[in-house]
């Protein structure tokens, strides 16, 4: 029996009681694996969450999609996009836009998720791709930012590459859900990219990621074994081929 699809209210009731699991998914195969494994939350691109097979393979995964403020230039753009995504099967909208945009969406009852700490689309303002809130002053500023997101109506924020003690204290002080990517176990969810877990990352693997399998290496090994089998004649074998009766074969040869 398929598990029931979780709601924002369900996730909120688990705050402080259970660490949720969260993945960035980009394919139907990853979505099916996440559903089978019992993953709680997924961040998925728009083209995946709107795929006609997505909810068939991941019916119970709470699924967030979104665009950055660089892609949605106005609050109305975000609202229009959010409506399309929720109608297609998304459960929440990621928004890296302003607090005014967050508030605008929340007033229209859109379940909206913000982003604090290292935010790739805004990294130039925090010194590039590096940790945030490593000083008392910057940690206080981060807390104030999270509180502002809560006041604006966001139900959650991704909190990325922040010292764990800072993230844990913010989580204690606020009702806002904190989804941790490199911010420690004191948050409400642990968030990794599927490609990092599966060993399929191109280039640098972030420090906060953990590689559980080496699919990239295994894929190359499988292809190399196929190449060697073809060269040696080990492939194809009889079980890979269609049989023909001897009588029909002889008739063909004599024809």
Question: Locations of the language-model features?
Answer:
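Alpha/beta enzyme core
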Residues: 1-255
